[in-house]
């Protein structure tokens, strides 16, 4: 459940929220109102995280309302869509994300929501859709991001083991991250 991201990130940031960064690999902006699995990014901004140091990789254009897309833009959040990831590659997307999220040299938290992956890769993720990134790209992103000294925390979210396929591919992917 992606609602863990809020508490996990705050724990990583400690007293350094003003210089902190956030990188999400997620199909959704997570900018909903309230306290839910669709609101951790908004709640972190409300807590004081600078939205200009937030980078969202893998945003799916058809899984987000135009209101959330406009909100992300107006807040100054850097969005690298699935289409852009396909064009520039996951390595370049991660490099750009680290530069932006780490601009103030504060701690970075990474949120890996597996709904960023193609539905065929993560059948145990109810929000996954066709057209997402591959398991290899998600693993590559996790390795690239966590090799940076500013990345101090990472969460893996949205795996419902009771819904996985017979070969347990989602669970195995989560374990390999």
Which sequence ranges carry the predicted segments?
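Conserved alpha-helical scaffold segments that buttress catalytic/binding sites
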Residues: 1-177
């Amino acid at each position: 459940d992606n609602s863990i991201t809020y508490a996990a990130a705050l724990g990583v940031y400690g007293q350094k929220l003003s210089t902190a960064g956030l990188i999400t690999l997620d199909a959704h902006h997570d900018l909903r109102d309230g306290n839910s699995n669709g609101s951790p990014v908004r709640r972190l901004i409300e807590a004081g995280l600078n939205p200009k140091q937030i980078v969202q990789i893998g945003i799916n254009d058809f899984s987000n309302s135009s209101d959330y897309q406009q909100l992300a833009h107006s807040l100054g959040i850097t969005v690298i869509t699935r289409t852009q990831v396909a064009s520039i590659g996951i390595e370049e997307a991660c490099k750009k994300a680290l530069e932006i999220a780490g601009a103030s040299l504060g701690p970075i938290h990474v949120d890996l929501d597996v709904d960023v992956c193609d539905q065929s890769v993560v059948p145990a993720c109810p929000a996954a859709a066709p057209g997402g990134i591959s398991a290899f790209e998600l693993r590559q992103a996790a390795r690239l991001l966590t090799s940076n000294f500013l990345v101090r925390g990472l969460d893996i979210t949205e795996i419902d083991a009771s819904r996985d396929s017979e070969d347990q591919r989602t669970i195995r992917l989560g374990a390999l991250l």
